[in-house]
């Protein structure tokens, strides 16, 4: 089976609305027996949340193996590692990482700092992360999409 991959934000949907023509295009791809993989660099939603959103918008079942996000890659990366992780990000990110790994709220106990989306950073938080790095801690960052355009309503043609 051949596979095609597509981005989500701005390609399949804008905010919570399907982009006109997407459903018809995906039905056409299904007719040609193409497996569709949905890719995003957004780490603010768990893969299950994205799958549920797509199912509601597309009116079809979406398997989790069709979803590729930074969290999917993170889960695979951490699969056989046993390390304490300090999460500097949203509650959603902390909850997801806590479901797949050992999370600590004490950065000094961590072997890995994971930086995700967080609306505001303090200088103390930045200093603590730098100190952890200088003490040998691995630092990993998920995207901060500075180019994402937020549109309140999809453009209709």
Predicted regions and their residues:
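Substrate-recognition element of Asp-dependent hydrolases with the DxDx(T/V) motif
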Residues: 6, 26-54, 84-89, 138-147
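Short, charged N-terminal beta->alpha structural module
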Residues: 76-100
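Asp-based phosphoryl-transfer active-site loop
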Residues: 2-18, 38
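Catalytic-core regions built around general acid/base machinery
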Residues: 21-33, 128-135
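Short acidic low-complexity segments
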Residues: 101-111
